[in-house]
């Protein structure tokens, strides 16, 4: 059974057809500009199916979700196609990818917001139930970069980041960031998919407001990450 057949069995023909339309848009645009290295079955497996399964244990209908550096829309757009009632916002700094996401939004008649800019310049005071990112940066950098995007009240924002087989080493390197940024790790969840790859979700919240010096400017975060 290929990935499309598996998706059809799990989510129905209508949803599978919309995901197929999304994949075709990616493939067409990838011929013009390099949007993603995923193609063929890898696009379906790692781009589409894995994205859905990573978010599925956490995000429910009507939850608000912020996806940082989504690129062509992974992991949030495939999940939105399956769960159209999710309130999605995407931050993407690459203008070509933003234009592609706008085309996806129009052609598939999806409802989501796109912010074209860097995450540190996103200063809208909006509560998000969940914040996610995939393949954007090491965990200690992600933690600082996104510290001001999450809320404590009226309920804590859940940070859920997609990581690979080296998730434990990233988590160990982030221990000082966890202390300084007053975070609490809730869960390390292994995502089981039908192909041979280890995917883990690191789930945490922030427990208190932190010093105004955080997050630092991007160049300082990169040059001297919290360790």
From Swiss-Prot:
It is an enzyme of class 2 (transferase). It is found in: Cytoplasm. Gene3D superfamilies: Vaccinia Virus protein VP39. Keywords: Cytoplasm, Methyltransferase, rRNA processing, S-adenosyl-L-methionine, Transferase. GO terms for molecular function: rRNA (guanine-N7-)-methyltransferase activity. S-adenosyl-L-methionine binds at residues 69, 74, 119-120, 134. SUPFAM superfamilies: S-adenosyl-L-methionine-dependent methyltransferases. It comes from the Bacteria. Its EC number is 2.1.1.-. The keyword Mitochondrion does not apply. GO terms for cellular component: cytosol. Belongs to the methyltransferase superfamily. RNA methyltransferase RsmG family. Specifically methylates the N7 position of a guanine in 16S rRNA. PANTHER family: S-ADENOSYL-L-METHIONINE-DEPENDENT METHYLTRANSFERASES SUPERFAMILY PROTEIN. This is Ribosomal RNA small subunit methyltransferase G. It comes from Mycoplasmopsis pulmonis (strain UAB CTIP) (Mycoplasma pulmonis). The gene is rsmG.
């Amino acid at each position: 059974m290929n990935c499309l057949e598996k998706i059809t069995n799990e989510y129905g023909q209508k949803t599978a057809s919309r995901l197929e339309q999304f994949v075709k848009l990616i493939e067409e645009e990838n011929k013009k500009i390099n949007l993603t290295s995923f193609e063929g079955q890898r696009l379906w497996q790692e781009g589409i199916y894995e994205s859905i399964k990573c978010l599925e244990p956490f995000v429910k209908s009507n939850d608000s979700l912020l996806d940082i550096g989504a690129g062509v829309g992974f992991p949030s757009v495939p999940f939105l196609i399956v769960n159209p009632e999710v309130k999605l916002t995407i931050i993407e700094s690459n203008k070509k990818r933003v234009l592609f996401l706008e085309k996806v939004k129009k052609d598939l008649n999806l409802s989501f917001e796109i912010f074209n800019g860097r995450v540190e310049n996103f200063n809208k005071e909006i509560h998000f139930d969940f914040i996610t990112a995939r393949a954007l940066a090491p965990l200690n950098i992600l933690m600082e970069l996104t510290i001001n995007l999450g809320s404590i009240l009226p309920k804590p924002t859940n940070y859920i980041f997609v990581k690979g087989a080296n998730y434990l080493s990233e988590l160990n390197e982030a221990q000082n960031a966890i202390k300084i940024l007053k975070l609490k790790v809730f869960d390390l969840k292994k995502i089981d998919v039908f192909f041979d790859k280890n995917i883990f979700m690191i789930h945490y919240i922030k427990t208190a407001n932190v010093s105004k010096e955080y997050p630092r400017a991007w160049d300082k975060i990169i040059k001297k990450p919290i360790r």
